[in-house]
């Protein structure tokens, strides 16, 4: 491929990584659909058991894979992006929140971790309410 300008270079360099991230995200989305459906079928839908199971399992996977990919086996940025942005991002974004908060705690940033916890929960619930109210105006 002949690269004519910086945009071509950027597109050429990142396209394979983006494709792998997208495929991993597709797999994560299918896993989320399957697991949340299986749990909801088993335990009912009076409580969001399926979502809770996906979020909890996603956090477990995020912690384990973070250790394995950063501490035990050094993996390439593309593989890490596939796993954390693609697979786990498609599976649950709550795992990103959990992993980022854990990293702050591990690095001794207790105040930032607490701010992240409070802001994510308060802002998240508040913005769901705002979105609900705004949609009701349409």
Q: How would you describe each model-predicted region?
A:
Residues 2-138:
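Membrane-interface helix-loop junctions in multi-pass transporters/channels
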């Amino acid at each position: 491929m002949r690269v004519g300008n910086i945009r071509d270079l950027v597109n050429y360099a990142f396209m394979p990584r983006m494709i792998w991230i997208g495929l991993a995200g597709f797999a994560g989305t299918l896993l989320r659909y399957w697991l949340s459906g299986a749990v909801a079928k088993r335990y009912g839908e009076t409580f969001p058991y399926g979502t809770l199971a996906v979020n909890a399992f996603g956090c477990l996977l995020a912690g384990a894979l973070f250790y394995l990919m950063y501490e035990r086996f050094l993996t390439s940025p593309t593989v890490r992006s596939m796993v954390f942005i693609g697979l786990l991002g498609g599976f649950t974004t709550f795992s990103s929140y959990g992993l980022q908060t854990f990293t702050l705690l591990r690095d001794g940033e207790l105040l930032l971790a607490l701010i992240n916890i409070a802001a994510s929960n308060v802002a998240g619930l508040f913005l769901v309410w705002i979105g609900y109210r705004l949609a009701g105006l349409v």
